[in-house]
Amino acid sequence: SIWGNQSSILVGDYLLSRCFEMMVEDGNLEILKLLSSTSSKIAQGEVLQLEHKGEADLLEENYIKIIELKTAALFSAATRVGSCISNLDNKKKDALESYGKNLGLAFQIADDALDYFSKEKIFGKEIGKDFFEGKVTLPIIILFQKANSIERAFLTNSFKKKEREKKDFED
């Protein structure tokens, strides 16, 4: 895109802050608490992902924790907010929140797989972006688990580089 990720982040920050303003104006403390908690979780997930950047031997549990804190938390909050606005009982709120979390996990796992196995025209964005950014996702975790020692060394070296090359991605 012309403006890159930075404008998307700024727009997202603006929308989040606007949501907080609206919740304060509305006086809905349940939603305000949920949104503030969710933004904290997303930030924790970003930090955790940065801590593990370039680790080809990332454990699956750590990957799941990262996507729980990021994508799943966002989907979970969206469904919970909808249930709060609809004045549903707590059992239904909890069920929708759980649904949102699981939908977020499924979405992120599928998105991560498509980053390696889709075509750019179909996927709608650059293929291999996670690889080039040094983000280890489930396809790499599974590949690393099934790899022999030579393949593991290749993956480890590829992810330790400051910049990964197209040749590394294609190999």
Residue ranges of predicted features:
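All-alpha prenyltransferase/terpene-synthase fold signal
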Residues: 1-171
